[in-house]
């Protein structure tokens, strides 16, 4: 290892030594300077131009000693590229610096007017793109994916009229897509996925690219309608995890269903309406179809029997009714089938079980027996779920854990095993045989009754005992106190109670793992506590970091109803919500499991951050993101979902300081009588002082308190709301501004934020704005955000 390092240093020293022998006005000199500045180990010897051009796979030159192509992918180049290096190679046509650790680009890079292909993917570039990117008039391929580039996509990109491939995915681009992009009519592939792009797409976007084969806009914040994107040449379209709305037929130009080229279509997690189009039969190459989680009208199963290439089909939460057609058995290549959360009826049809790996038919109204060939295949599948139907099954080989996870509310109709009475060498006496059978049945029934009585007694005793998690949180019990029991029986029971990990079905755990990871839910592992229960930090088996929310006991919901609620919560997806990834139902304890992404909550940011005050831009970003999350719960979910505990402690900030609202949907799992005046805090509206249940309007009030907390930097204690409202009525709202903000405070913006907080905290619920209106008001404060 030492010899190798010493050899690299010798190479590098020799490389720098001969740099001075090159003409400073040649490509050889600029290239040598580039490799030297980027600390390239094992660099090529630079004493002649030919030695540079002979380095295989990296540099290609012409006879005039011009560098035409540079391919330096994955060479561990690091740092900033200085000026007067590659930016001076005026004949350069191809530049591939992908898979390195480059942090910034030289200002003269954009002068390379002959550049045809630029690949800077998988680096560490964070600075915004300059407008002079439009100088690349000859560019065909632009790949800046997997960086941290922020700001807008510059309008000057419209100058790249020869562009065929645009890859900007997995960055931090914000705002909307520039309208000028529609002038790049040669585009074959567009990938803008996994950014923070929002607003509506430019007018004519769908029909602007007649040659387009691949479009990926997934995992952004786009809204509005999209017209004419599913034209006859397109092969791949992914619009998932956005806020697109409008009729689904608008996607089809002229409503002509000619999709002979379509291979991949994903429209999931949007708000499209209408009916699933029945013209899919022409898409004979279609292999991946995902239309899940939209707002389609009630409809029968679409025609899919001719989609022989289909290997992935997800139509969950698409409002399907009636039966699953038998023609689905023709799909012999199908690997994933998800039809969950619909209103499907009838029997489970015979499926082609040869290739299937994932099957989810849960939360429907299916009845009858599950086909035996399908049951026999389940052991070889990655994931399956038949829960919450009217189905029956018989497979004595299933473990109790499997039944509790995938057959919830499903009847096991396996008969009791009975050994036949066999008499060897003697004639059977029918009278004695009948007597023995009767006696055996009587004894069996007696044992059964005794067993049932023992179970009832055990349950009664267990109800009277103190629960292990909630009591510990409420009473602050010490780990070794006599009130806390941890008997061998408890441990045995804990190992038999499964944990359901929704997106990680192969991750097998039990309640015992959760207890071990939190030291039996010790207060020392608690992250925060609220009305919906304490939340504990844990590292689960396999190194999975989790946040475990223990919901207080006493709810009137059955285990089945709680399971349904958890499954539905797990399907709610929004960039500003902290998603549920699993759950555990343990007698009277209901545990929600979230992935702990090492986030900080807003309460800590504002009040436990010493002298390091959060700037106004960040505070506005947090307010807007939280408002969007609440607007989605109130107006994007059917039926509308009340949060019930909006406060600084339940607003988490990820690594990009994007807010994630936690604990949503848990209010349904609490007592019907929501905690009243004895648990009031500064976020509670006046009407809840009378033990009223939380409402959409009370969520708005709580958000208003959070907004005033962001503006003032004060904790919601004492009389914060009345103090700020009094200042506003006196025309002195600016006095509420947090004096610790470090930057020059845009007083006009903060004054508007104070007014929004004033509106949200109105005494009368009907005077408060909706969360949709609040989002609009916050966007108007800083329209460029």
Curated annotation (Swiss-Prot):
UniProt-annotated glycosylation sites, renumbered to this chain: 119, 162, 198, 216, 258, 314, 319, 343, 385, 390, 397
LRR repeats: 64-88, 89-112, 114-136, 138-160, 161-184, 186-208, 210-232, 236-258, 259-283, 284-306, 307-330, 331-355, 357-377, 379-405
GO MF term list: ATP binding; protein kinase activity
Positions of modified residues (Phosphotyrosine): 594, 683
PROSITE patterns cross-referenced by the UniProt entry: LRR, PROTEIN_KINASE_DOM
One GO cellular component term noted in the UniProt record for this chain: plant-type vacuole
Main location: membrane
Residue(s) carrying Phosphothreonine: 510, 518
Signal peptide: 1-21
Membrane topology: Single-pass type I membrane protein
Keyword Acyltransferase: no
Disulfide bonds: none
Extracellular side: 22-436
Binding site for ATP: 527-535, 549
Sequence ranges on the Cytoplasmic membrane side: 458-785
Keyword Nucleotide-binding included in the entry's annotation: yes
Pfam families hit by this protein: LRR_1, LRR_8, PK_Tyr_Ser-Thr
Domain of life: Eukaryota
Subcellular location: Cell membrane
Transmembrane segments: 437-457
Keywords of this entry: ATP-binding, Cell membrane, Glycoprotein, Leucine-rich repeat, Membrane, Nucleotide-binding, Phosphoprotein, Receptor, Repeat, Signal, Transmembrane, Transmembrane helix
Occurrences of domain Protein kinase (ranges): 521-785
Family listed: Belongs to the protein kinase superfamily. Ser/Thr protein kinase family.
Domains as described in the record: The protein kinase domain is predicted to be catalytically inactive. Lacks the conserved Asp active site at position 645, which is replaced by a Glu residue.
Official protein name in the record: Probably inactive leucine-rich repeat receptor-like protein kinase At5g58150
